C-alpha cells in the first residue's frame, strides 16, 4: 500500500495506518445503538492515550458542537434520528482527524438538509487536508466533489 509518499508493507503496519490515519463514514452509521453518544465517540478517540480524560471530554464536546449536537453526550444513540446519528459518526471522525476518509453512501438515507450538513463536513475535512473518497449515487454529493470517477 502506498500512502502519503511512503510505502506501507505488511499486515501490522497497514492495520496500524488504518487505525491511526483512516476514518470511515458509513450509510448505516456504524454506531453502537445501546450506548451513549459520548461512549460511541470515545471508542474512536481511545487510541489517543496522550489526552487526559478531561481533555478528551472537551474534545468530544467541541466535535459535537461542530456538528450541531452540543449537549447530546448522554443521549442514547438509538433515540436519535438518522441525521443525528450520521452527525455523531462525523463527530467521531473529528476527534481524531483522519488523513484519509472513506465514505460509503454517507447521505444515502438522509433528508436533503442533513445531506447538506454531511457534505459540508466532508468538504471541511477535505479543505483541511484530508483525502476524502466517497462512494455515492447522489448527484448532490457528486456535485461537491473535486474529482469524479465513474464505475459502471
Regions found by a protein language model. Give the residues of each.
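A short, proline-enriched helix->beta-strand linker immediately N-terminal to the Walker B motif
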Residues: 95-99
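Helix N-cap at the start of a conserved alpha-helix in ABC-type nucleotide-binding domains
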Residues: 112-114
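Hydrophobic anchor residue at the start of the ABC signature
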Residues: 90
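Conserved ABC ATPase signature
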Residues: 76-80, 84-86
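Catalytic Walker B motif of ABC-type/P-loop ATPase nucleotide-binding domains
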Residues: 101-104
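ABC ATPase NBD coupling module
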Residues: 2-23
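Short coil-to-helix segment of the ABC ATPase nucleotide-binding domain corresponding to the Q-loop/switch region
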Residues: 35-44
Amino acid at each position: 500500500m502506498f500512502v502519503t509518499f511512503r510505502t506501507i508493507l505488511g499486515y501490522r503496519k497497514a492495520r496500524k495506518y488504518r487505525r491511526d490515519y483512516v476514518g470511515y463514514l458509513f450509510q448505516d452509521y456504524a454506531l453502537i445503538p445501546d450506548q451513549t453518544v459520548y461512549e460511541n465517540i470515545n471508542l474512536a478517540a481511545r487510541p489517543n492515550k496522550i489526552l487526559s480524560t478531561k481533555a478528551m471530554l472537551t474534545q468530544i464536546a467541541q466535535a459535537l458542537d461542530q456538528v450541531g449536537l452540543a449537549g447530546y453526550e448522554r443521549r442514547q444513540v438509538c433515540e436519535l434520528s438518522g441525521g443525528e446519528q450520521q452527525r455523531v459518526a462525523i463527530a467521531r471522525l473529528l476527534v481524531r482527524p483522519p488523513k484519509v476518509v472513506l465514505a460509503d453512501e454517507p447521505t444515502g438515507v438522509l433528508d436533503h438538509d442533513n445531506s447538506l450538513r454531511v457534505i459540508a463536513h466532508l468538504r471541511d475535512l477535505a479543505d483541511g487536508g484530508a483525502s476524502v473518497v466517497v462512494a455515492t449515487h447522489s448527484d448532490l454529493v457528486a456535485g461537491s466533489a473535486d474529482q469524479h470517477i465513474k464505475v459502471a
